[in-house]
Amino acid sequence: MALTPIGFGAWAIGGGNWEFAWGAQDDDESISAIHRALDVGINWIDTAAIYGLGHSEEIVGKALKAASHKPFIFTKCSMRWHQDRSIYRSLKAGSLAEELEGSLRRLGVETIDLYQVHWPNPEEEIEEGWAQLERFREQGKVRWLGVSNFSVEQMKRAQAIAPITSLQPPYSMLRRAIEAEILPFTQAHGIGVIYYSPMVSGLLTGKMTRDRIATLPADDWRRRAAEFNEPRLSRNLKLVELLREIGDGHGVTPGVVAVAWTLHHPAVTAAIVGGRSAQQVEQMAGALDFRLTDEEYGRIVGFLGDHPA
């Protein structure tokens, strides 16, 4: 499976009115964003059943019906919802079977390219859940198996049952914890790393200001996020100005620089980059090719060292 350096992240296009929403979203704009991502050369889409409580998968499915060519489709399981829209987690075999059928139906596909355990919860069900995913693979319903948000020890438990194709962790210049143990482990075991939030959920795009953050919709989870609030926000906005300075020298946005910084690490495979409109996708298309020099990478590392969280 040869992936482009960035993939289209479909979290935000799930829309509003659920616990981890990004606010209201126009479905036609979402479909246009997906089509534009494919047009600029992005060859994979990452979504999850829980995004918009199924709505993100439905929108991806609609976009695929009218797409000029078909990308790799990745989705995730283990987070479910009740009729009152409250979320619960399960890795029970029967629950996962129901989830898979729902995802296949919403996406309008017969096979999912990469099926991932979204979170290792409940932890005592990891083995049961991973064994069930391996059965899905044997049945031809999924092609590859991945995990998301797993620790090294949790990956070892899964590996004892069936191989792991990929890990999906958070990774950005503000969230570097995986560099210590997780990336050395995945590199040693041939596990791909497709990571989320390289731009810290939009914070490093260059579009976020204090005023914009203050007026985020009430159902936008970022209003509660530590990086979007003091005491971290001031440091983060200064970091964006450094990214802007570097990007201006190459004609790219701060967001493209932020993604390029993460892609500089030799143990990562590709970055998940969200887009809520065709225009946003076009602004990020430069991340397919742009790379930082070692000197530019070091300038950012130096700033982070001088301005700890």
Pin down the residues of each PLM region.
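Beta/alpha (TIM)-barrel catalytic core signal, keyed to glycine-rich beta->alpha loops juxtaposed to Asp/Glu
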Residues: P120-H307
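N-terminal binding-site loop/beta-alpha segment at the start of enzyme catalytic domains
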Residues: M1-P71
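Acidic (Asp/Glu)-rich catalytic clusters
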Residues: A2, G61-F72, L104-G108, R137, ...
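Alpha-helix N-cap and loop-to-helix initiation/capping positions
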Residues: A21-E29, H55, I59, I87-E98, ...
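Short, acidic/polar
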Residues: G23-A37, L91-L107, S151-R157
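Active-site groove signature of glycoside hydrolases
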Residues: L104-P122
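A short acidic, helix-capping loop that chelates divalent metal ions and anchors anionic groups
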Residues: G14-F20, R80-I87, L204
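A short, structured active-site edge motif that brings together acidic residues
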Residues: K70-Q83
